[in-house]
Amino acid sequence: FFARVAPTLAEFQDAIASARDSSAAPGGVLRVTTGAAFGRHYVVPLIPAFQRQYPGVRLEISMNDNMVDLIRDGFDVAIRGGTIADSSLITRRVCTLAMVYVASPAYLKKFGTPKTPEDLVNHQIIALRFLSGAISQWDFRVRGKAVAFEATQPTLTLSDTGMVGDAAVAGMGVTRMALHFAWPHLQAGRLKLVLMPYNDPGAREMVIHYPHREHVAPRVKAFVDFMLASLEDEPSLHATLKDAAPYAA
């Protein structure tokens, strides 16, 4: 019973708070969920500035790659990657999540540069395992058709999206990762792009979403607006494949 009435009660409480505090600074507890790697790299570094601007807001941030139900799990805001099609949520786009294939210059010097997806069978592969247990599929476009590569025997398998890039920088093999995570490594020369003519970047997006309510709590609006403005100014989140082309091996 409580699970059914909790969202309605929360909406009622937020409406009262919004009406009462419309002229006051945002305050109260704000519960946020985000992916582990994205949270470490992009969300947490922005928190000091947010709290200086909104000292009355107390943040609780959960960083993991679990599947999250915003309402059921009691979160106010989610910052997540994927395709969001829930009409009960307000969705605000942060950036496109283009995927790329990378390896370190040292690895490529030792093992050579893969020229086609078929070459990957002769390379060390750094794979990502989802919480479901499945290994992330690598997608390519070959002669206009979608082709999937599945690493049956990866050299290294990790469950953290940020760590696959660190492993690639360490020269442990070829991996697939989001361009925004690869961007600083590409600029610094720690990674090179491979298989660019065949790369399928995907169609996923990083979004901020929160419950669709008539009265959005001031603390929610303040946090969402602050994050959108701050992340808009982060170059790595808006780098394109065209921008990345000079970093190809």
Identify the role of each PLM range.
Residues 167-190:
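A ligand-binding cleft/hinge motif common to bilobed small-molecule-binding domains
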Residues 27-90, 239-249:
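Central regulatory/effector-binding core of bacterial HTH transcription factors
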Residues 88-128:
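Flexible hinge/capping segments at coil-to-helix
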Residues 56, 183-184, 188, 198-249:
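C-terminal effector-binding regulatory domain of bacterial HTH transcription factors
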Residues 126-144:
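Secondary-structure junction motif
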Residues 59-63, 149-160:
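Short beta-strand-to-loop elements that line the ligand-binding cleft
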Residues 10-33:
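Short helix-loop hinge/linker segments at domain boundaries
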Residues 1-11:
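Basic, amphipathic "hinge/linker" alpha-helix immediately C-terminal to the N-terminal HTH DNA-binding motif
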